[in-house]
Amino acid sequence: MKXLRKNHPLFKIINHSFIDLPTPSNISSWWNFGSLLGMCLMIQILTGLFLAMHYTSDTTTAFSSVAHICRDVNYGWLIRYLHANGASMFFICLFIHVGRGIYYGSYVLSETWNIGIILFLTTMATAFVGYVLPWGQMSFWGATVITNLLSAIPYIGSTLVEWIWGGFSVDKATLTRFXAFHFILPFIITAFVLVHLLFLHETGSNNPSGLNSNSDKIPFHPYYTIKDLLGILFLLTALMILALFFPDILGDPDNYTPANPLNTPAHIKPEWYFLFAYAILRSIPNKLGGVLALLLSILILMAFPLLNTSKQHGLIFRPITQTIYWILIANLLVLTWIGGQPVEYPFTMIGQIASITYFAIILILMPVSNTIENNIIKL
């Protein structure tokens, strides 16, 4: 068996990636979220596959087909709620994974980091098109508002929007193509995940101390396979509690009303995991400016490897940048809260302040604190 594992062309790759992989001996539970994201992706693909067997992507029957899944399909309600809440768990793990990368300076592995950001954007696109599929009120109006943003692009904007819609409004053609995108994108994500892992295993994993750990490595199996299994157990417990006891707590009640183009909901808002970006979008009065700020709110993560001037790796021994980091986290929570509030005073002003603070922390405060800490080390 050992000879097969180490010599077989296919098993050899698996062996070098998950069994005999030399791993730093001191990586903490914050490093569990990569495997949890892999687990989330598998859950989403499997539940999505079973939902796709019963779902119809036609405007007249889409809403009814989701109701049919919940009422008539064996455990359809469970599959649907596991899929909906699985997306929330996916994004919770994703945010923690990115947050850990920033805290411990994992962005110095720039290839892995940049592929990770592309993965983040692809996951956001998948979640957006997926939210449109049940064809409730918030699905329809969310799709209308977000796709309409593309009309802000000079010259080609209006044509581009009509091309994506497949007509002059969000309708049957839009829903059909969104179902197709939602089906294909998870497999594209899976391909990117493999590239992400490929780049990670080229350099080896980062660790909490930020020091080179080549002198102190242990095999991935059994130490970290057991650790990951514990994390997966916690994840599945949380997901089952959400799906069985609070299935609609993270959803929008408006989505239980069938889509009606003649009736606009009072507050159009996306799912909770997009609210921080939505708040940044709304805080800029200009349409094109808002769209650019929305894009930059994610793409700014690519600036971390470029803006890093610190002599130390990670924030574990850097109290000034550490404080700024936690202010950034608090700021993101404020943005998430503002994104779900109506567009009125004082929420608009809080959103504008939080948006400016978000960009200022990453582009100004963190690089400045890096320089200050470098000078303190010299003293």
UniProtKB/Swiss-Prot annotation:
**GO: which molecular function terms?**
metal ion binding; ubiquinol-cytochrome-c reductase activity
One of its Pfam families is Cytochrom_B_C
Keywords, in A-Z order? Electron transport, Heme, Iron, Membrane, Metal-binding, Mitochondrion, Mitochondrion inner membrane, Respiratory chain, Transmembrane, Transmembrane helix, Transport, Ubiquinone
Give the GO cellular component terms, alphabetically. Answer: mitochondrial inner membrane; respiratory chain complex III
Q: Any one Gene Ontology biological process term?
A: mitochondrial electron transport, ubiquinol to cytochrome c
Locate the residues binding heme b b562. Answer: 83, 182
Query: Any transmembrane segments, and where?
Result: 33-53, 77-98, 113-133, 178-198, 226-246, 288-308, 320-340, 347-367
Q: How is the cofactor bound here?
A: Binds 2 heme b groups non-covalently.
- Report the InterPro entries cross-referenced here: Cyt_b/b6_C, Cyt_b/b6_C_sf, Cyt_b/b6_N, Cytb/b6-like_sf, Cytochrome_b, Cytochrome_b_C_euk/bac, Cytochrome_b_N_euk/bac, Di-haem_cyt_TM
Sites where the protein binds heme b b566:
97, 196
Which family does the UniProt entry place this protein in? Answer: Belongs to the cytochrome b family.
Function noted in UniProt: Component of the ubiquinol-cytochrome c reductase complex (complex III or cytochrome b-c1 complex) that is part of the mitochondrial respiratory chain. The b-c1 complex mediates electron transfer from ubiquinol to cytochrome c. Contributes to the generation of a proton gradient across the mitochondrial membrane that is then used for ATP synthesis.
**What else does UniProt say about it?**
Heme 1 (or BL or b562) is low-potential and absorbs at about 562 nm, and heme 2 (or BH or b566) is high-potential and absorbs at about 566 nm.
* Protein name in the entry: Cytochrome b
**Origin organism lineage:** Eukaryota, Metazoa, Chordata, Craniata, Vertebrata
Which gene is the coding source of this polypeptide chain?
MT-CYB
